[in-house]
Amino acid sequence: GYSISAGQRKLTRFLLNYHFNAQDIWWLRTKGMSEEFCEYLRTYQWKGDMYALPEGTVAYPHVQMVRIECDLVGAILIETYLLQTMNFHSLIATKATRVTGLNTHTPRSVMEFGTRRAQGESAGNDGAYAAVLGGCVGTANCLAEMKFGAEVKAVGTVAHSFIEFFPTEFDAFKAFADTYPDSVSLLLDTYNIMESGLPNLIKLDDYLIEKYPNDPNRRVKSARIDSGDLARGSKRLRKALDAAGKPYIKLVASNGLDEKKIANMELYEHAHFDSYGVGENLITSASDPVFGGVYKLVAVKQPDGGYTPKMKCSDSASKAIIPGKKMPWRLYDENGQAQCDLIAMDDEVIEAGKPVTMVNLDSDAIERTVTITPTKVKKLLVPHVLNGQLAIELPSIAEKKAYIAKQLTQETWESELRLECPHKHYVNMTPAVAECRSKMYAELHGGKV
């Protein structure tokens, strides 16, 4: 399996502006915080370093998404925000790549429709951003476009309530078209799709042709159905619209969709939809609603500049944290596909064209130690914040979308991308990391990993 690492943009901006205001200090005093500590926080600014995967990087278990280097107080203060931000953004961006078909190399047009089912305002806005990163063409959340810009485009159709308000369905359609003649997108299932919605759609488009005969842009752009047998409805509508000389009107489906329902309609029912609106199953990632990223202390810097590794143990050796200040690398074969990820100590250098000996993280692996010669290697963590200052030019959303698509189509094994029983990506350790982990686990917990 795979995930998409996201949230770096928001986390970076948070760290650059991290401080306590007067109201924060007042409230902390009411909770018994010492005057000395409150005074310390009054002038506190986060001055640490943040190394992270570039936003949109394909990520795997055990491989760090973010590495924080700062004072202990700063590391503790940002923990909850870091986890909330990275976990939620990564969850939705990953789900979006599945819904939009990027993982199966069959991209489809999907709009994010889930704001009303999101767990709160921030989830609605951040989820829209992450969904667009993962391949969605836009969102029904207008506030998201206002916050993030035109790359998170606000899209959608009219509501059932709008149509119900008017004396007739055609009156509603006409009112909308007269107000927004350049972006007429209608909803057909308020009353009866074939007996009412379709005839009124054709009537409205004929009205626009008569009103704007020399402006082909002022036509009905699309029509959505939100109930009933979607696949059957799409075929009936497509046939009727083509027969009426209106093949340019696109069909949109919504109503409890996810990647599996869409795939079933396309593969087995031959549905004729041009686009999909996906709501709660995307904005909540209903099939896998939790992204379990953790944030652990792995090393403490000493006065001489060296680092003492630290480790949180577990009765399950596989859950034991990998200690030490580390740097993950990605190793590629001659075809440009990622062979594996390699967790190395920060001062270790991995070189392309030279044999690399690795220890498999899976203790049950038949071959615990393997050696490969990668054609290309890439150090995965890049500095985003250094000494509290921005250290990277944050790419545009379009650049990040293209980056995600390139990885999924050119660099990731198809077997890792499938929905059912995906192949497990190889994540290995250098011998130095493996030895440090095994030695510390034996000392602290009395066993071996």
Description of each model-found segment:
Residues 32, 38-47, 56-247, 257-264, ...:
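Buried, small/hydrophobic-residue-enriched core segments of structured protein domains
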Residues 25-27, 94-98, 114, 416-422:
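Short coil/turn segments at secondary-structure boundaries
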Residues 1-29:
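Intrinsically disordered, low-complexity, positively charged segments
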Residues 2-5, 239-244, 249, 257-449:
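Gly/Ser/Thr/Ala-enriched C-terminal appendages of enzymes
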Residues 13-16, 52-55, 59:
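An N-terminal, globular interaction/scaffold subdomain
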Residues 185-187, 252, 277:
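Structural detector of well-ordered beta-strand residues that form the stable sheet scaffold
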Residues 48, 53-54, 252:
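A structural connector/turn signal
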